[in-house]
Each structure stands twice: as structure tokens, then as C-alpha cells.
Amino acid sequence: MSLPTHSHDDQATGLRQMFAHRRMRFVPVVSNPHIGFGGVLLERLCTAFAERQATTLVVDAGERAGAAGEMALVDLGQCIEPLSKKVSYLAANGLSIRFVDAAGSTRAFLQRIGEAAPESDIVLVHASASELCRMFSQKNPGAAASESACPIVLAEDHPASVTHAYAAIKLLAQRAGLPVFDLVLGAAPQSPRAGRIASQLASCTDLYFGGVLRDWARVDPAGDATEPPGAELDRIVAHRLVGDFTARPARLDIAASAAFS
């Protein structure tokens, strides 16, 4: 049986209305199985958003995330775990594909999240590049609903993680039409490789498939996840909060490390 031709338009309209009224931002965060401190990098992003008074939901569909239970298909909101006043967490490994449509898009998953967590200002969708392509592709009908999506790519200062990050950036650019990205790089403050890695990713992605590294931030995996973010990470967050949440209050207690381990 064929699907109604207007289904994509209805879905896109619903997403646009949701964004317009709730000011919710969906931020694709590319998971990387070759990094040992992915949870720390996610924590630092949450801290940076909280410093700007934004409430964050982490939708964790990464390779090491827990699987969503059957209740997620019945009442997704009941599966969201509050970690602090500013951060909530949803284990979502394997969940998005349950919302796939006939065109291969899982954009409906984003709409369901928006309905389940209307109080969230930021939704960090942590997943593999292929999953993010299905959710955020600009080549699918209704792409205008996520036209500002700019993936955050996670990596560390060793070859395997950088190679994986490069492949993910290429996939997002070619399959999803998302060539612009930010990089959050886990590296010690004294690492001599961090700057070179960012520079090489910028030049190689530009040369081979037109990728654009908009900004990057170094995050010390051994640092305190609740410390205020540095200027580099704050810039990456600010890109996603243009026009809102400009104030930066005093340090906030959002310790939630156990959930991201």
C-alpha cells in the first residue's frame, strides 16, 4: 500500500511549529567508538550550555549507550532521566530506527523527542554519523525544519579517533548535505598534536569534499567537568544559542558523570 504523498509535508510542518513555539535546538553530536572519554566531552558540552542558562537533554544513541526499553515506544517521557536542574538523559541506542519512514528518514524521532521533553532548550543527539544522516539530512523532504543543524564531531588526539572522525564528516557532507561542522577534541593542555589535528581535518575535508571546520575546542579529559567552559567551547555553544541565553551566570552544579560513562 502506498503512503500519502503529503505525509512528509505534514511532518515538516509539525517540526517547524514545534521549533517556532518552543525554541528547541537539536544539535547532532557525532559519536566516536575510538575515544575513551566521550562521556567527559558530552559533560563539558552540557556544562557550557548550562552556563548560558540553557536546559539540555542528552539523547544518547552512541555505540556504548544503553538500549531503550519497550516503554520508549509507549511513553518516551517516562524514559527520560533527570540528572540535575539543567541536564536530563535518555538512553536511546537503537531507538531512532523504530521511527523510520518509507524514504529512510528518522526525522519523526526528533518530533517525538520534542513532544516528550518540551521543557528542553537544547537536545544533544549523540549518535553515529549514519544515524544522524537519517535524522538530519538536508536531502530529505522537510529539511527546512533542521536547516541550521551543524554537527559537533568528537575526537581525541590519536590516529584511530581522528580517522573515524574524518570518515564521519565525509559521510555527513556527502549523504546528508551537512558539510559544516565543529570539532570538540579531547586532549591534554600540553598536547602538541591538538592544533595540528584540527588544522589537518580542516584542510583535508575542504580539499576532498568541501567540508568546512567552523570552530574547534580542546577539552582536557582530566579536567573538572563542572568547571566553567573555556572560550573555545563557549564559542561552539554560542553558535547554537544566537539571540538567546546570552547571560553567563555563576558556576552551576550539574555533575552527572555517572550517566555518561
Q: Where are the predicted features?
A:
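Conserved catalytic-core segment of NTP-binding enzymes
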Residues: 105-218
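Extreme N-terminal targeting and regulatory segments of eukaryotic proteins
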Residues: 9-16, 34-38, 42-47
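Helical mechanochemical/support elements of P-loop NTPase systems and associated helical scaffolds
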Residues: 11, 38-41, 161-164, 197, ...
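Extended, low-complexity, amphipathic alpha-helical coiled-coil/linker regions that act as scaffolds
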Residues: 42-45, 67-71, 187-190
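Short, glycine-rich nucleotide/cofactor-binding loops
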Residues: 28-38, 153-162
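C-terminal lobe/tail of nucleotide-utilizing enzymes
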Residues: 2-28, 178-261
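P-loop/Walker-type NTP enzyme "switch/lid" segment
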Residues: 19-36, 54-122, 129-130, 138
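Histidine-anchored nucleotide/phosphate-binding helix
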Residues: 40-51, 166-174
